[in-house]
Amino acid sequence: MDIRKTYVIIFFVGILTISFSSYNIGQTRLVVIQEQEPHCIGPCEIAFGNRPCNEECTSQQYAYGFCDYQTKGEDNPQCCCYTS
């Protein structure tokens, strides 16, 4: 009797797992992230980090900003602002 009970429990757990995974797949919405070009407003002060850059960007009505080390290289990071 114990083996039959174990198999029934495993069966119901399997059915429950499949039903939840099918539910999630059916309800998933695809979110398209658009690649946006940053608006770089000037060089970053390496000693201060991202905080002054973010504050400057938010004061200019951007959502956020940070020091971008890829725009002009590691030696000359730029403060780049983003809208979203």
Swiss-Prot record:
Location relative to the cell: Secreted
GO biological process: defense response to fungus; killing of cells of another organism
Keywords from the named record: Antimicrobial, Disulfide bond, Fungicide, Plant defense, Secreted, Signal
Main location: secreted
Signal peptide: 1-21
A single cellular component GO annotation: extracellular region
Annotated organism of origin: Arabidopsis thaliana
Protein name (Swiss-Prot/TrEMBL): Putative defensin-like protein 63
Keyword Signal carried by entry: yes
Superkingdom field: Eukaryota
Paired cysteines (S-S): C40-C81, C44-C67, C53-C79, C57-C80
Family: Belongs to the DEFL family.
Keyword Amino-acid biosynthesis belongs to the record: no
Annotated InterPro entries: Defensin-like_dom
